[in-house]
Amino acid sequence: MFIESFRVESPHVRYGAAEIESDYQYDTTELVHESHDGASRWIVRPKSVRYNFRTTTTVPKLGVMLVGWGGNNGSTLTAGVIANREGISWATKDKVQQANYYGSLTQASTIRVGSYNGEEIYAPFKSLLPMVNPDDLVFGGWDISNMNLADAMTRAKVLDIDLQKQLRPYMESMVPLPGIYDPDFIAANQGSRANNVIKGTKKEQMEQIIKDIREFKEKSKVDKVVVLWTANTERYSNVCVGLNDTMENLLASVDKNEAEISPSTLYAIACVMEGIPFINGSPQNTFVPGLIDLAIKNNCLIGGDDFKSGQTKMKSVLVDFLVGAGIKPTSIVSYNHLGNNDGMNLSAPQTFRSKEISKSNVVDDMVSSNAILYELGEHPDHVVVIKYVPYVGDSKRAMDEYTSEIFMGGKSTIVLHNTCEDSLLAAPIILDLVLLAELSTRIQLKAEGEEKFHSFHPVATILSYLTKAPLVPPGTPVVNALAKQRAMLENIMRACVGLAPENNMILEYK
């Protein structure tokens, strides 16, 4: 059964005029390694900690500024939100299609809230806590191309022609602000697009981004802004002592116009200085140590890296299943070809390397979780290949072969072919990242014994379900298994309204 909304009634939850407060018992374990009678042993002790959560329920008018607004992802997301807001329908060869938010965790998925008369009851994910309605988002952003969003949508060749014709009047007036362009960080083939760039030193470019954010916020009358990078994949930046290893060194390097400070890092610095959440949707190391240091000191949300949309999402499910079933993956070979501008940019070796790292590390935590299958340091052979084939456009092909060892020396091979409509998968993920980033800035918590409420750690692990290479605070384990990531996100939101984690025990029927 499906219900549209619900309200929690509990002595541990209080609904106020502008906030929800919950008193929550967090049950976990602590491990101790000790010696006993001359032998060492592990002791696992159940542990309970009480937390108070406070969530502001006033939903702001939210502005979204996309770096790479005129790209396939930016134009597709903008078009999709307008189509939903205006209730647009259009003819395809199969049927009359209605605008929707399919592919969005927040808008098109559900959560289990209990059972009634022997039937499972589900509610929209977005009903857990008050969220921004995506129809109300205000878009802006930057691009190194000055093409308006209507023409960018046409260039992308993602949406049906009938839909494009209806959207054009809404998008023709949307023109990206000039962006930061550094040909050293992206493929040389992107130079032909670069007719809309910010001139000057790196410090002057960063200051212009700050000015742009302030002017956008003032002109659009939004309460909050979230900035997200959906521009070209950059090459990795060199991390060097004295250059970008600390907050002080990073800012000094910007002042000195050091060449190794990337455009994405400049955008991120500008956002952190303004207290604006910044999310990196590409695989490069935007968040160098000095930037993470800066974000922590300024208590400003940062999240990333790289949208998890197609092949990697499948991989994080399948390998988790195999290892969890006691099956040993020994070889993972992933091949992609695509023909959009992302593929064109990734045809350069230095930018492909960023993507290769992002896609290759996704199974690490699953492998390390099972020392029965893998010895220390052992890892499956893992190869990632990406090729540029212009004809296929945004319709990315992904082919994977998984070879595993099974019972008594047997071998198992799984082969997948996945046609990933690249931007149509990425756009709702961008939407979720923006909405969840904003929501997380309205949540505060304090543990038992703490005097004051505080926000989540600025490095937003809550967004990890949506990213290939989740950014985590120093010393925090990286979790890539998709089911664990979704459970973490859902259970934190459940805690905010005093609901227990969904443990699937269903003891009432046992």
From Swiss-Prot:
NAD(+) binds at residues 70-73, 143, 180, 190, 193, 230-233, 281-282, 306, 309, 340-342, 355, 393-394, 422-423. Highly expressed in embryos, but transcripts are undetectable in roots, leaves, flowers and anthers. Keywords: Cytoplasm, Inositol biosynthesis, Isomerase, Lipid biosynthesis, Lipid metabolism, NAD, Nucleus, Phospholipid biosynthesis, Phospholipid metabolism. Its EC number is 5.5.1.4. It comes from the Eukaryota. It catalyses: D-glucose 6-phosphate = 1D-myo-inositol 3-phosphate. Its cofactor is NAD(+). One of its GO terms (molecular function) is inositol-3-phosphate synthase activity. Gene3D superfamilies: NAD(P)-binding Rossmann-like Domain. It is found in: Cytoplasm, Cytosol; Nucleus. Induction: Induced by sucrose and glucose. Induced by abscisic acid (ABA). GO terms for cellular component: cytoplasm; cytosol; nucleus. It is an enzyme of class 5 (isomerase). Signal peptide: none annotated. The keyword Mitochondrion does not apply. GO terms for biological process: inositol biosynthetic process; phospholipid biosynthetic process. Its main location: cytoplasm. Pathway: Polyol metabolism; myo-inositol biosynthesis; myo-inositol from D-glucose 6-phosphate: step 1/2. Key enzyme in myo-inositol biosynthesis pathway that catalyzes the conversion of glucose 6-phosphate to 1-myo-inositol 1-phosphate in a NAD-dependent manner. Is a key enzyme in the phytic acid biosynthesis pathway in seeds. Belongs to the myo-inositol 1-phosphate synthase family. Plants silencing RINO1 show a low phytic acid phenotype in seeds, and high accumulation of inorganic phosphate (Pi) in seeds. This is Inositol-3-phosphate synthase 1. It comes from Oryza sativa subsp. japonica (Rice).
